[in-house]
Regions:
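Non-catalytic, substrate/partner-engaging modules appended to enzymatic cores
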Residues: 1-456
Length: 456
């Protein structure tokens, strides 16, 4: 990996949040501490469409409604499996391409989740439910004329158990919620976007967008973290030292399916790094590139909070309107001017508009405010340009960029029960908002490994 120096080997768990750009809290209260995801049933997620159709209720009703269209809308229940891998397994089972399966969003691996998927209706065997091992169960719901997408999702609902809290003080939680209601919740990209124990995605993404593909492949396979399992760490270390791919395939934990596919590709074509990266699902290739932009967004947002600009609407800011469901309308942004500053500030306060920041891509508009200046400063620090996101070697992974609210546009939070052993909560968030980011303000753990069931 000429020119690339391994980073993760010296990364401590207490440095993870700084590494992925999450370095500020908006609330000033003490955290209740505790851990989440120590058991898979402690973290449950389901989707509600804009039509109000709840994926858990649809799944449990066992009703097929018929309908018309070229797509079959189903609910997929998955257990301890990430959404990209789940879609790949469904595609393999049905002998179709993964890109033909529609998704509203990617759900956490360490969870039980119920999410909508669409599958092309033109093959035999449907509309019958089916299972894949003990991890995936798919139940058809109805035929529809469209492929499901994030635009159709209203909200994600979470039931979460916080175990071993340091404080079981409901008033402390209520005080934090009041503060979040007043100030807003920073809309960071969450820890799982990058990986907590091995935050590799943005590292590989930066190498890809700089056309350093050999190094990108090598980093994906051999960059190890002191926080991952000892077996994974040892195999990656040996790959880095010896590059014995045949041995590594035999020794690699079975869960690391993408690494095995990449190594098999390299054995067949040792210098074809484009082919090697293309064994990864398209959604994952795009996610890897977009993680660079996500990290830049996070670091910019941290600077905005640090300089006390989070709740200030400035001339030059970009804003988007919010629909009656609380969803941000995907339209051309409005730039704040001296003339409309007062009106827009009132609309932001009333949650009818929201300040947005670019998640960089090759067509990103830039706010002409201090927020835009902070974004440009972070990009310069990272050595990344907007044109970098037009990926020459993997054009299918290129990203135009998007606009993301700096605060979570709408949310609801409810404590179901609280005692010395646990705090049970229900949380609703809009698409693309992260439960761990919201819980971070409530928990404020000493160590971010608390978000994967370790420490407290």
């Amino acid at each position: 990996m000429d020119g690339y120096k391994p980073i993760l080997r010296s990364l401590k768990s207490t440095d993870i949040e700084e590494f992925i750009g999450i370095s500020r809290y908006i609330s000033t209260t003490k955290g209740v501490g505790g851990i989440i995801k120590s058991r898979v049933e402690d973290f449950m997620i389901w989707e509600v469409l804009q039509s109000g159709e709840d994926s858990v209720r649809v799944f449990e009703s066992n009703l097929f409604r018929g309908g018309y269209g070229e797509q079959l809308l189903c609910v997929m229940k998955k257990v301890k499996l990430d959404s990209i891998r789940a879609v790949s397994l469904i595609a393999k089972t049905l002998k179709i391409k993964s890109v033909n399966i529609g998704l509203c969003g990617i759900k956490d691996k360490a969870s039980i989740s119920w999410q909508y998927v669409t599958i092309p209706a033109n093959f035999s065997g449907f509309p019958q439910p089916f299972k894949i091992n003990n991890f995936i169960e798919v139940k058809p719901f109805k035929y529809v004329p469209y492929k499901v997408s994030p635009r159709m999702l209203w909200k994600n609902v979470f039931k979460i158990k916080i175990r071993s809290p340091k404080y079981n003080d409901i008033e402390l939680i209520n005080e934090t919620i009041r503060e979040l209601s007043s100030k807003g919740v920073p809309n960071y990209y969450g820890h799982q976007r990058f990986g907590i124990t091995r935050p590799i995605t943005s590292i590989v993404g930066k190498l890809i967008i700089k056309d350093r593909l050999e190094e990108a492949v090598s980093a994906f396979l051999s960059e190890y973290s002191i926080l991952e399992s000892s077996r994974s760490r040892e195999v990656r270390r040996m790959i880095a030292e010896c590059w014995n791919l045949k041995w590594a395939i035999e020794s690699m934990p079975k869960s690391l399916v993408y690494e095995v596919k990449m190594m098999r590709s390299l054995i067949e074509d040792p210098e074809d790094y484009v082919k090697c990266l293309r064994v990864l699902p398209l959604r994952l290739r795009r996610l890897i590139v977009e993680s660079v932009a996500s990290e830049i967004f996070n670091k910019s947002l941290s600077k905005i909070i640090e300089e006390d600009k989070f709740n200030e609407v400035e001339v030059g800011d970009l804003v988007l309107s919010v629909d009656p469901l609380g969803r941000v309308r995907r339209e051309r942004p409005i730039m704040v001017t001296e003339r409309n500053l007062k009106q827009i500030s009132e609309m932001v306060k009333d949650k009818k508009m929201v300040v947005v920041l670019p998640v960089p891509g090759y067509l990103s508009p830039i706010p002409r405010s201090s927020k835009g200046e902070k974004l440009l400063a972070v990009m310069e620090e990272e050595g990344v340009t907007f044109d970098d996101f037009k990926v020459k070697a993997l054009p299918e992974a290129s990203t135009k960029g998007s606009l993301r609210p700096i605060s979570i546009p709408f949310w609801s939070f409810f404590v179901e029960s609280i005692n010395d052993e646990s705090i049970n909560i229900e949380l609703s968030l809009p698409p693309s908002a992260y439960a761990t980011v919201f819980l971070r303000e409530i928990m404020k753990p000493d160590n971010p490994l608390a978000y994967i069931g370790i420490g407290g």
